[in-house]
């Protein structure tokens, strides 16, 4: 535990002050206290904290050319993956209910899409409305099935003898 902070007050003799002087001094100190509290709430520095040295802030780490290229490649991959998912979703929605090849070709030839991708949605958290792709759903008619156990091998049965 740290020791309580000592505050030095100017030497004032209570005997020499009249009641009016003490009331005036109290009012002045209360207004100073209020002003200091507001300054602290606003994030301003008070006189006592400016004398305390703060920890030095380390300079930003320099970025090498290789690190820069790696970061660019990672960002591009994340954004491209997110864009591909969104494009697939929009294409599937636009051709939903199409039954003939001519209809499908006509829709795909005239298809225009606008998508928006951001790094916020690319970090693994799906953005709102994302993650509802057909093959990710629990629909039995989905294009992919859930992984199942191998049917070719039987599970080994272990017997423990006493």
From Swiss-Prot:
Keywords tagged on the record: Coiled coil, DNA-binding, Host cytoplasm, Host-virus interaction, Inhibition of host innate immune response by virus, Late protein, Viral immunoevasion, Virion, Virion tegument
InterPro entries from the UniProt entry: Herpes_BLRF2 (IPR008642)
Similarity remark: Belongs to the herpesviridae BLRF2 family.
Region (Disordered): 121-162
Role played: Plays a role in the inhibition of host innate immune system by targeting the CGAS enzymatic activity which is the principal cytosolic DNA sensor that detects invading viral DNA. Acts by inhibiting CGAS-DNA phase separation: directly binds double-stranded DNA (dsDNA) in a length dependent but sequence independent manner and is able to form DNA-induced phase separation in infected cells. DNA phase separation of ORF52 mediates disruption of liquid-like droplets in which CGAS is activated, thereby preventing CGAS activity.
Organism, as annotated: Epstein-Barr virus (strain GD1) (HHV-4)
Keyword DNA-binding found: yes
Protein name (record): Tegument protein BLRF2
Coiled-coil residues: 12-43
Subcellular location per the Swiss-Prot or TrEMBL entry: Virion tegument; Host cytoplasm
């Amino acid at each position: 535990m740290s020791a309580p902070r000592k505050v030095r007050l100017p030497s004032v003799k209570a005997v020499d002050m009249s009641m009016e002087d003490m009331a005036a001094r109290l009012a002045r100190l209360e207004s100073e206290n209020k002003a200091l509290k507001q300054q602290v709430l606003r994030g301003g520095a008070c006189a006592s904290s400016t004398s305390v040295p703060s920890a030095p802030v380390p300079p930003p780490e320099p970025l090498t050319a290789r690190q820069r290229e790696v970061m660019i490649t990672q960002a591009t991959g994340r954004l491209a993956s997110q864009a591909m998912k969104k494009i697939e979703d929009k294409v599937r929605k636009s051709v939903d209910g199409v039954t003939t090849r001519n209809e499908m070709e006509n829709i795909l030839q005239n298809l225009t899409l606008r998508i928006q991708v951001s790094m916020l949605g690319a970090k693994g958290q799906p953005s709102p409305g994302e993650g509802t792709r057909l093959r990710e759903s629990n629909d039995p008619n989905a294009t992919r099935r859930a992984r199942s156990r191998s049917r070719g091998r039987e599970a080994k049965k272990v017997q423990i003898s006493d």
